[in-house]
Structures are given as structure tokens and as C-alpha cells.
């Protein structure tokens, strides 16, 4: 049995200039962030792992215009051992992005069951259990706005067999 905790706090301040439509434009970015990682092993057969990151960016490109972006990213994983040969993992991911112009929430769930013998390993992965098909997010930099679009594979079952030599 055990518990591990890791905490990081961050702050950055950046001033710069960028050429925008033929004019030198000043900008500034303030970023505040916190990251927390928890690992718990309440009993020998169970491992709990939780990671969370929260970041807030303030980006000013023009004297009177400030964009505020928030990012929350979480991952939770539960690992269970059934004896010495069977292992089961469940992984849940959540991402939340919000700004003055948009909000995106993404929730993903995967699972894996694995049996390990002396000469062979058999695994079954279940991916995208919640059926998420596509999502997009916006990342603001000091000089540009980048839009990311993601298309995910549909729910899938993958069976793997590995031989140990």
C-alpha cells in the first residue's frame, strides 16, 4: 500500500512584438498553471493513477483586446491484478478547453484486459468505448490562432497475441 503526490505550480510572463498586416504589434502573454499527479496503491492488486493539469492564458495582442483561454486536462487510470497473470486497466480521459469564443469538452474511455503466461501473452483492448467521433480545439499563440481538428476511430476491439522467445 502506498500513496504518491506530485504538485507543480507555474507562472510565465512574456512580452514581444510581431509583424501584423505590415505593422509591428506588441503582445503579451501571462500563463498560470497547476499540475497534480496522484498515485495510490491501496492494496497490492489495485493501482489508482490520477493526473490533472489546469492552465489559464491571458493573451493581449492589441491595447484593448485580451483573450483568456482555459485548459483542463484529466486522466484517471485504474489497474487491477487478478492473481499473477491477469491484468485489467480502465483509462478515462477528459479535456476541457474554453475561451471567450468557444468551449470544447472531450471524454474518452478505453479498457484493456491482458493474460500473461510463461511463453505467450494474450490481450484484448477496447478503444473509444464512448463512441466519440470527432472534436476540435483552438490554441492561441502570441502571434497566431491554430485550430486543431481530430477524427477518432470508431469503437474498436483489438485482440493481440505475443509470443515470448
Task: Name each model feature, range by range.
Residues 1-165:
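Exposed, low-structure sequence patches enriched in small/polar residues
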Amino acid at each position: 500500500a502506498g500513496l504518491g503526490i506530485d504538485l507543480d505550480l507555474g507562472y510565465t510572463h512574456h512580452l514581444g512584438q510581431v509583424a501584423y498586416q505590415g505593422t509591428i504589434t506588441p503582445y503579451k502573454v501571462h500563463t498560470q498553471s497547476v499540475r497534480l499527479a496522484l498515485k495510490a496503491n491501496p492494496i497490492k492488486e489495485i493501482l489508482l493513477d490520477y493526473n490533472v493539469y489546469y492552465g489559464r492564458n491571458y493573451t493581449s495582442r492589441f491595447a484593448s483586446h485580451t483573450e483568456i483561454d482555459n485548459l483542463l486536462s484529466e486522466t484517471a487510470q485504474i489497474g487491477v491484478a487478478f492473481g499473477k497473470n491477469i491484468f485489467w486497466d480502465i483509462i478515462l480521459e477528459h479535456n476541457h478547453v474554453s475561451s471567450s469564443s468557444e468551449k470544447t469538452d472531450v471524454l474518452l474511455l478505453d479498457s484493456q484486459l491482458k493474460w500473461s503466461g510463461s511463453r505467450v501473452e494474450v490481450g484484448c483492448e477496447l478503444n473509444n468505448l464512448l463512441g466519440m467521433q470527432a472534436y476540435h480545439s483552438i490554441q492561441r499563440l502570441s502571434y497566431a490562432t491554430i485550430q486543431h481538428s481530430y477524427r477518432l476511430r470508431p469503437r474498436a476491439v483489438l485482440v493481440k497475441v505475443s509470443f515470448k522467445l
